[in-house]
């Protein structure tokens, strides 16, 4: 069709019992948009939820040892949660990918451990960190239908032959990788979907930032993909303030800034953004 649709789902941020309303919203969104891929952009797991109390880690660098029994229990709880919010995708045969936010790790599991668990579920296309420099994500058949990373059709049926493939670009950081989207003839990349692990917390306070390795990976991507990319990450960029306009606190649609910007209220700057944008 020449079209490729991405559905982004952010901040599910639930414990082991995912809200029925959340699952219903995911189902309705999938049916309304019929995406080719879904990207979960962080904070899928509310690591601070009481269910994870025995393995809770407030900051990644906390040195207190967590008993293996608690971690093992948490792994099962995480599997239970993931199974609930990815079930609508599995039943519809929609592939998906995830990156991480500032609360996922607080359950006590590292992003690498979470990545391993996510890959157990049907439809997940997260690559092993620093995997093969070139890895198949989609195989384009003569009829144009895609074959997913694990060799199954999008509907979960058996493997079939393919006529070409697109490369996946993994990195050393779990949750950071690139998915090139090819044209209908599978001859060239026309778009890159880039997931970035944007960090969680900084030692000096406040939120963290992407690692130097992640930034180096991103810097090399334009030449490797050869097409413009869309980037998906959890943490908003400070540069977002460059497309906002300060207004009075009682102005229509005004939103309060954060931390050093907390004394100012903003709306989208119409001269720097496209029509139809939303700040909220």
Each language-model region and where it sits:
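Active-site environment of divalent metal-dependent phosphoester hydrolases
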Residues: 15-16, 46-49, 98-110, 201-204, ...
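Active-site neighborhood of phospho(di)ester-bond hydrolases with catalytic His/Asp-centered motifs
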Residues: 7-10, 38-43, 96-102, 231-233, ...
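Short, glycine/charged-enriched secondary-structure capping and boundary segments
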Residues: 22-23, 53-56, 111-115, 245-247
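Extended active-site neighborhood of metal-dependent phosphoesterases/phosphodiesterases
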Residues: 61-228, 248-260, 265
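Beta-propeller domains
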Residues: 229, 233-244, 258-280
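N-terminal active-site segment of His-dependent metallophosphoesterases
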Residues: 1-84
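Short, solvent-exposed beta-strand-terminating loops
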Residues: 30, 37, 45-53, 232-257
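Active-site-proximal beta-strand elements of phosphoester/diester hydrolases
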Residues: 3-13, 190-200, 232
């Amino acid at each position: 069709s020449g079209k490729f649709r991405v559905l982004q789902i952010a901040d599910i941020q639930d414990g082991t019992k995912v809200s029925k309303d959340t699952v219903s919203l995911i189902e309705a969104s999938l049916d309304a948009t019929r995406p080719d891929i879904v990207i979960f952009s962080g904070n899928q797991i509310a690591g601070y939820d009481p269910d994870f109390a025995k393995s809770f880690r407030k900051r990644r660098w906390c040195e207190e040892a967590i008993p293996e029994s608690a971690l093992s229990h948490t792994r099962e709880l995480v599997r239970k949660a993931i199974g609930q919010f990815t079930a609508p995708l599995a039943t519809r045969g929609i592939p998906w990918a995830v990156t991480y936010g500032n609360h996922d790790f607080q359950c006590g599991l590292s992003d690498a451990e979470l990545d391993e668990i996510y890959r157990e579920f049907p439809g997940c296309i997260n690559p092993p960190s620093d995997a093969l420099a070139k890895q198949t994500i989609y195989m384009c058949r003569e009829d144009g239908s895609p074959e997913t990373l694990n060799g199954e059709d999008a509907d979960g049926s058996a493997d079939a032959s393919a006529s070409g493939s697109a490369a996946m670009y993994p990195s050393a950081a779990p949750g950071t990788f690139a998915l090139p989207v090819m044209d209908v003839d599978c001859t060239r990349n026309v778009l890159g979907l880039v997931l970035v692990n944007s960090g969680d917390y900084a030692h000096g306070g406040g939120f963290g930032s992407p690692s130097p390795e992640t930034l180096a990976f991103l810097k090399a991507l334009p030449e490797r993909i050869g097409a413009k990319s869309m980037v998906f990450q959890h943490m908003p960029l400070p540069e977002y303030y460059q497309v906002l306009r300060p207004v009075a606190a009682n102005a229509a649609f005004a939103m309060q800034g954060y931390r050093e910007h907390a004394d100012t209220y903003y709306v989208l700057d119409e001269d720097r953004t496209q029509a139809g944008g939303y700040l909220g």
